């Protein structure tokens, strides 16, 4: 028996059975307990979801922007009312501590929907005068049916981030959550339906990458929004272009630099470094895993980091006191342990952690100790490649120019941060760093108002902020002639 039983697809405002006859299992990463059997969508199911979305989108787009805004605000209220219930499911599915999911995942997802509900009525065109008797006006119109493909680290938050601007602009969305954490997207679908979103406007199809490929290549989908790894992102972009030249926005991986200058408040810098590496057990795309510390303060900074690592409370995610849980899956655990072994083999100095935790109840879960390496070099695998786990690499530097060059020496460009009391140096450095999301004397917050996305191979386009509405609308230009028409022939 599983905890949540059989999970079906959500199409046309209701749960429906998949036609594939296939299911997959999802497990609690803290205990290994079977959470649910989940039905896998077939190609026919994807077609059914897209057709339902087309029908629902026409009804949704015909509403006024104010009507759509009111419905989305009702969804926000329902999300907040069900916060504790949804957080409990998210904790079981992802392994995140309950204190984290209660305070962050649903809360921030609801905030983004509320933000775009407020902007729905502000989507407008321009009027461009040409001459006394002629002008042009533009309309921002919805794209139609969009596809959202989510990652496993923030399941419901990502679903909210993708649906909020899409629905606010009058689109429909077919969403595929990660097969590793598939549960809460279905709850969001229930909430949208209860709030009054027309049937078909938000459909959920479950499955592995083959289902994502069906969505990406579907000729009746106008846009794909993807969150995940770089290599998968490249496949998404290629298939989207080859199928129908559909628009793509992607938030991909990172190997982000955190730069600590010698005038930094060391307590603040250590606090930032620890949260930038160990929040959500290090499974955050924007993690600042390359910690560059000016040489004169490296020892003092490292000591403060290690003090804080000792205070991390690793435990059962369902315990209120826990602030560090397991990794999301056995596969992710093996990957992280492989990186740790690589760091040791390449000569990095292990300062903390570096092992799987197996004592007591830890033996049933995918736990790895918070890990800190010192004496790291830029050419090490743990410094070059995204780990997506709780592994911090500390590197030292001498000069501002040196650290900027080294920080930019990567094909990633998602995030970056600077800790310094010198405001001029902070801005000067940030302006030279090749990253789309940057923080000065803080780390990690991504409010609804803030556009987020990467440079280089860390992504295309943005999520959140006003600019994201541009990715979910298309411009129609209309010329109006009020005067006499002058024929050419």
UniProtKB/Swiss-Prot annotation:
Top-level taxon in the UniProt lineage: Bacteria
Keyword Metal-binding: yes
PROSITE patterns reported for this sequence: ALDEHYDE_DEHYDR_CYS, ALDEHYDE_DEHYDR_GLU
Residues forming the catalytic site: 162 (charge relay system), 251 (proton acceptor), 285 (nucleophile), 463 (charge relay system)
Disulphide-bridged cysteine pairs: none
Positions contributing to NAD(+) binding: 150-152, 176-179, 229-232, 253, 285, 386
GO BP annotations listed: glycine betaine biosynthetic process from choline
Record family assignment: Belongs to the aldehyde dehydrogenase family.
Protein's recorded name: Betaine aldehyde dehydrogenase
Organism: Burkholderia vietnamiensis (strain G4 / LMG 22486) (Burkholderia cepacia (strain R1808))
Gene designation per UniProt: betB
């Amino acid at each position: 028996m599983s905890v949540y039983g059989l999970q079906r697809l959500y199409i046309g405002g209701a749960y429906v059975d998949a036609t594939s006859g296939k299911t997959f299992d999802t497990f609690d990463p803290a205990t290994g307990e079977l959470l649910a059997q989940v039905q896998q969508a077939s190609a026919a199911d994807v077609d059914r979801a897209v057709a339902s979305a087309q029908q629902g989108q026409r009804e949704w787009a015909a509403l006024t922007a104010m009507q759509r805004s009111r419905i989305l605000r009702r969804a926000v209220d329902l999300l907040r009312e069900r916060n504790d219930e949804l957080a409990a499911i998210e904790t079981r599915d992802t392994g995140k501590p309950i204190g984290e999911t209660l305070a962050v995942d649903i809360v921030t997802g609801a905030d983004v929907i509320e933000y775009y509900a407020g902007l729905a009525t502000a989507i407008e065109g321009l009027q461009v005068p040409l001459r006394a008797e002629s002008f042009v006006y533009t309309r921002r119109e919805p794209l139609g049916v969009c596809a959202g493909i989510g990652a496993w680290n923030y399941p419901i938050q990502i679903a909210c981030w993708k649906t909020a601007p899409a629905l606010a602009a009058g689109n429909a969305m077919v969403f595929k959550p990660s097969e590793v954490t598939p549960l809460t997207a279905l709850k969001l679908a229930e909430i949208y339906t209860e709030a009054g979103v027309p049937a078909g406007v938000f459909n959920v199809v479950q499955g592995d990458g083959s289902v994502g490929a069906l969505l990406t290549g579907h000729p009746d989908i106008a846009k794909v929004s993807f969150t995940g790894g770089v290599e998968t992102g490249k496949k998404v972009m290629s298939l989207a272009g080859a199928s129908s030249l559909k628009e793509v926005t992607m938030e991909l991986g990172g190997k982000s630099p955190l730069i600590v200058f010698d005038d930094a408040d060391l307590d603040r810098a250590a606090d930032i470094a620890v949260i930038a590496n160990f929040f959500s057990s290090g499974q955050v795309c924007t993690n600042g895993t390359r910690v560059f510390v000016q040489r004169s303060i490296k020892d003092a900074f490292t000591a403060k980091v290690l003090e804080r690592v000792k205070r991390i409370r690793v435990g059962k995610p369902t315990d209120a006191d826990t602030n560090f849980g397991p990794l999301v899956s056995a596969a992710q655990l093996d990957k992280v342990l492989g990186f740790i072994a690589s760091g040791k083999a390449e000569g990095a100095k292990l300062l903390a952690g570096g092992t799987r935790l197996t004592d007591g109840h830890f033996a049933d879960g995918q736990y790895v100790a918070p890990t800190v390496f010192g004496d790291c070099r830029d050419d090490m695998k743990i410094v070059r490649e995204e780990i997506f786990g709780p592994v911090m690499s500390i590197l030292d530097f001498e000069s501002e120019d040196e650290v900027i060059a080294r920080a930019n020496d990567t094909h990633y460009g998602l995030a970056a941060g600077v800790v310094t009391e010198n405001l001029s140096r902070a801005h000067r450095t940030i302006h030279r760093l090749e990253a789309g999301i940057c923080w000065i004397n803080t780390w990690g917050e991504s409010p609804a108002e803030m556009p987020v996305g990467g440079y280089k191979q860390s992504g295309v386009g943005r999520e959140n902020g006003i600019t994201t509405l541009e990715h979910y609308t298309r411009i129609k230009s209309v010329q109006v002639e009020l005067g006499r028409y002058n024929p050419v022939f």
